[in-house]
Amino acid sequence: MEESLMDVPSTSGTQVYSRKARKRSHSPTKKLRYVKRRFSLLRPEDLSVIVQPTHYVRVTFSDPNMWYLRSGHHLHSVHNWLKPYGGQPVSEYHITLALLNLTDEDLARDFSPIALFLRNVRFELHEFALLRKTLVLNASEIYCANIHRFKPVYRVNTAIPTIKDWLLVQGFSLYHSGLPLHMSISKLHALDDVTRNYIITMPCFRTYPQQMFVTPLAVDVVSIRSSNQGNKQIVHSYPILHHPGF
């Protein structure tokens, strides 16, 4: 609190000083800081339920020995390197395209148009990465005039967005995991964090760039284990009919 001095005449002829208090002015914004805010009552429509996926759409491929390897290592060699560390090969190779929350009515519908969208589509598998506790290969949809003649490879993004748009238009509920497009290769769940981080930096994964080309054979709609008493079940499966010679 600021104080000012003022002269006051004294009866004894001497000059004395008295102090007059002056209040400091406060800005309106500071006063608002202490105003109690009123909150409206919570309404049912204000609540949102986080729905977990029940099924996923995936593409499957032929035997890995049939895949075209342009550079890097075959997968059986990778598994041989990881075996002493406790790495477990995945039971099947696939790429997940979408996560869905499906009802019994949804499961009775036709998902075959997805196979049409993937006609004459190839995927490139490249760059080993550690995704949570799994060794994966990044995946990209590609266009290449002739993969066997080392023609330029163009990474495109057309079929998968089309599939997701079609699912939304059909009224299906999509779940966004935030994970990049990938193919799981080996489970490293039994390893500690230090060993997992060491594996991903091993020279065998970094010396030569990994590049493989795979052609999808079928589209599956599969139930997630947690939503089906821990059992995975293929609900629908549709073959992908590529053009002859593709």
Swiss-Prot record:
Quaternary assembly: Interacts with host KPNA4; this interaction inhibits the nuclear import of NF-kappa-B complex.
Keywords associated with the record: Host cytoplasm, Host nucleus, Host-virus interaction, Inhibition of host IKBKE by virus, Inhibition of host innate immune response by virus, Inhibition of host NF-kappa-B by virus, Inhibition of host RLR pathway by virus, Viral immunoevasion
Keyword Cytoplasm tagged: no
Region annotation Disordered: where it falls in the sequence: 1-28
Record keyword Zinc present: no
Protein name (Swiss-Prot/TrEMBL): Non-structural protein ORF4b
Function: Plays a role in the inhibition of host innate immunity by inhibiting the interaction between host IKBKE and MAVS. In turn, this inhibition prevents the production of host interferon beta. Additionally, inhibits host NF-kappa-B by interacting with host KPNA4 and thereby preventing the translocation of the NF-kappa-B complex into the nucleus by this importin.
Record motif Nuclear localization motif, residues: 22-38
Gene Ontology CC entries for this record: host cell cytoplasm; host cell nucleolus; host cell nucleus
Taxonomic source organism: Middle East respiratory syndrome-related coronavirus (isolate United Kingdom/H123990006/2012) (MERS-CoV)
Compartments in which it is found: Host nucleus; Host nucleus, Host nucleolus; Host cytoplasm
Biased composition regions of type Basic residues, renumbered to the chain: 19-28
